[in-house]
């Protein structure tokens, strides 16, 4: 079989790795919806979903059946094409953002030299999905939620990008694998602590998670920009939000907590344990913090996060120049 060449085998293995990693991410995002409800029940001293399967373990299957068989309704007054396109963009952009995350020294979907810029580009693309969903629904609550989401996301993406520049300056590269290798001796969270704090805050805001979930506030906007969605279209938004949490958690691990580095255990296990810890922190934040007003969220971003990121960047640049002399 002369057509089986080493190059073809390498391509097939790369495709297999990509499929496995992306399937694991989607599965983790789906299971996180169940885990969140169980943990919220624990934090609030009540029962979570515990009726379907052992300990409620089949609740996810019940949710999937419900989602698959719900009517996929498109309002007559909506723009059908854009209304259908919005959840696809939201799901795909958040899933592709994980492609540049190195899970282990040998497992990464796309080892790009501009990995961080690719992540920021995908995060910016998700804003279009929210705007499309809000505008095409032709609903005042959807439009208000989309306007809130776009303003909030675009604002906090500024801090998200600036908080990473200190890490880039220290590693001397935008490549995620190079950044992880640069943390073999000391994790970036120590010299870049303020960068990590602002990245974590901006990451929660970009995911529209509590306490930055004003675009989806049920009490104010009746669930915001996806109020008109049902069935699998709503499912794409729903699972996409949890995929965003998985991606941000994985990026925290990769950029600030040494990625796969750790003693005794295999690299993939260390990466999974660290990522699971930050995913649990997202749930703990939701369970413990109140929701501020929208103007307070925006004011906090521009008056606290922006100065903090700029100070961190200036100090990092000064230290690098001092060490170079």
Curated annotation (Swiss-Prot):
Domain of life: Bacteria
Keywords: Cell inner membrane, Cell membrane, Membrane, NAD, Quinone, Translocase, Transmembrane, Transmembrane helix, Ubiquinone
Main location as per UniProt: membrane
Compartments (UniProt record): Cell inner membrane
Any one biological process term the GO annotation gives: aerobic respiration
MF terms (GO), sorted A to Z: NADH dehydrogenase activity; oxidoreductase activity, acting on NAD(P)H, quinone or similar compound as acceptor; quinone binding
GO cellular component entries: plasma membrane
Matches recorded under NCBIfam families: PRK06076.1-1, PRK06076.1-2
Subunit structure: NDH-1 is composed of 13 different subunits. Subunits NuoA, H, J, K, L, M, N constitute the membrane sector of the complex.
Stated name of the protein: NADH-quinone oxidoreductase subunit H
Organism: Citrobacter koseri (strain ATCC BAA-895 / CDC 4225-83 / SGSC4696)
Lineage: Bacteria, Pseudomonadati, Pseudomonadota, Gammaproteobacteria, Enterobacterales
Gene name linked to the record: nuoH
């Amino acid at each position: 079989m002369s057509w089986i060449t080493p190059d073809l085998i390498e391509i097939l293995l790369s495709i297999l790795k990509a499929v496995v990693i992306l399937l694991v991410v989607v599965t983790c995002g789906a299971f996180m919806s169940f885990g969140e409800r169980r943990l919220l029940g624990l934090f609030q001293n009540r029962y979570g979903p515990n009726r379907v399967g052992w300990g409620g373990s089949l609740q996810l299957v019940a949710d999937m059946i419900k989602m698959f068989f719900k009517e996929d309704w498109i309002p007559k007054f909506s723009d059908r094409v854009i209304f259908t396109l919005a959840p696809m963009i939201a799901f795909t952009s958040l899933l592709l953002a994980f492609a540049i995350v190195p899970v282990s020294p040998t497992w990464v979907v796309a080892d790009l030299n501009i990995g961080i810029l690719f992540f920021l580009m995908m995060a910016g693309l998700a804003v279009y999905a929210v705007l499309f969903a809000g505008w095409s629904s032709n609903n005042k609550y959807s439009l208000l939620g989309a306007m809130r989401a776009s303003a909030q996301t675009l604002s906090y993406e500024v801090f998200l990008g600036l908080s990473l520049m200190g890490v880039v300056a220290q590693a001397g590269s935008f490549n995620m694998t190079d950044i992880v290798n640069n943390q073999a001796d000391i994790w970036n969270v120590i010299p870049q602590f303020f960068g990590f704090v602002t990245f974590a805050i901006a990451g929660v805001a970009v995911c529209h998670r509590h306490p930055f979930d004003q675009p989806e506030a049920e009490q104010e906007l009746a669930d915001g920009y996806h109020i008109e969605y049902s069935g699998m279209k709503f499912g794409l938004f729903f699972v996409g939000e949890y995929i965003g949490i998985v991606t941000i958690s994985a990026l925290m691990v990769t950029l600030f907590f040494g990625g796969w580095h750790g003693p005794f255990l295999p690299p993939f296990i260390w990466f999974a344990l660290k990522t699971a810890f930050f995913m649990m922190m997202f749930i703990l934040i939701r369970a413990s913090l109140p929701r501020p007003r929208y103007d307070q969220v925006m004011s906090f971003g521009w008056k606290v996060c922006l100065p903090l990121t700029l100070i961190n960047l200036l100090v990092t640049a000064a230290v690098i120049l001092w060490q170079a002399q």
